[in-house]
Amino acid sequence: NWKVYPGDVGYDSGHTWIILGQCKDKSAVIVHSTPNAGVQISGTPTPSGSYSSQAITLAQKYMSRYAGYTKYDYHTSSGNYIRRGNYFRWNRSTLSDPDGYLNMTADQILADLFN
């Protein structure tokens, strides 16, 4: 199935990430932090392992706007976070979604956040 939702918190041994949104090809745009480059947006490959994913393309589009993209050599592709780790999902009756992100794709969410 490989369905993730905006706001899902993923984790495994030694790393944590937040899902910003999922693309139609089932890849996901995540936000995470690295020791050398700080907080960054990355895209995952598709669940089948293709690095020609919509999420990686979106991460490159948005991260290339910032000086750190070149200065810190941001990696806009990440490991296959869709298939690894565990996820914490917010209780829909507890946490509201005033912007409607739950029903948006990653490209719609990023356009809203960055425009």
What are the functions of these language-model segments?
Residues 47-115:
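Low-complexity, Gly/Ser/Thr/Pro-rich intrinsically disordered linker/tail segments
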Residues 1-46:
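...with weaker cross-activation on analogous glycine-rich loops/strands in unrelated enzymes
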